[in-house]
């Protein structure tokens, strides 16, 4: 058996790969003009093919994904061509903004645990924040800013305590250390 033949590509496999590649390139070529397509390098074409595949996979999974820039341009030109037909139906459409992770973080309010008001405390229902930043400080009522509030100041752990002290635990059994002397010292 010849080792060179085992690793050689079969013409059938090469034909399948080139057929798949040409089909993928045809799908992507519709997003570009002929001049742009001819100017593009092979690596740029391949990256566009991969971007489109990823977009299709993410939309099939149900994620709301933004279109790649090259795909947006084609849709914009297509919609301009069909605007005359769709002008009367345009008012019925509702445009929904795409939700990104950063936008989602800004929308969702940060929930702080509320401590129930105790009888005899003068907090009068004002929730108390817990955590290392606030160290039990009372929050101001909404709408009123605290005069002692500083914008860029973060209070960390107290300076007197070591940061790892809460992680240490006591030994259950005492360890007794004995001093071991060298045998050479005993002989002298």
UniProtKB/Swiss-Prot annotation:
Not detected in any normal tissues. Expressed in a melanoma cell line. Residues 1-22, 74-188 are annotated as: Disordered. Coiled coil: none annotated. InterPro entries: aKRAB (IPR003655), KRAB (IPR001909), KRAB_dom_sf (IPR036051), SSXRD_motif (IPR019041). One of its GO terms (cellular component) is nucleus. Pfam families: SSXRD (PF09514). The modification Phosphoserine is found at residue 123. SUPFAM superfamilies: KRAB domain (Kruppel-associated box). Keywords: Phosphoprotein, Transcription, Transcription regulation. The keyword Phosphoprotein applies. Residues 157-170 have a biased composition (Basic residues). Residues 75-96, 112-122, 147-156 have a biased composition (Basic and acidic residues). PROSITE patterns: KRAB_RELATED (PS50806). Residues 20-83 form the KRAB-related domain. GO terms for biological process: regulation of DNA-templated transcription. This is Putative protein SSX6. The gene is SSX6P.
């Amino acid at each position: 058996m010849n080792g060179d033949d085992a690793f050689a590509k079969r013409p059938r496999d090469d034909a399948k790969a080139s057929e798949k590649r040409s089909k993928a390139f045809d799908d992507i070529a519709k997003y570009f003009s002929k001049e742009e397509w001819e100017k593009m390098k092979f690596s740029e074409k391949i990256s566009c093919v991969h971007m489109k595949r990823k977009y299709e996979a993410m939309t099939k999974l149900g994620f709301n994904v933004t279109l790649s820039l090259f795909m947006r341009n084609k849709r914009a030109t297509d919609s301009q061509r069909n605007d005359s037909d769709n002008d009367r139906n345009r008012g019925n459409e509702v445009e929904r903004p795409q939700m990104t992770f950063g936008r989602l973080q800004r929308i969702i309010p940060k929930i702080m645990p509320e401590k129930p008001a105790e009888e005899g405390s003068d907090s009068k229902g004002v929730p108390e924040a817990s955590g290392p930043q606030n160290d039990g400080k009372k929050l101001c009522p909404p709408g009123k800013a605290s005069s002692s509030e500083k914008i860029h100041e973060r209070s960390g752990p107290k300076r007197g305590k070591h940061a790892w002290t809460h992680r240490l635990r006591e030994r259950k059994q005492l360890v007794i250390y004995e001093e071991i002397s060298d045998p050479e010292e005993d002989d002298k």
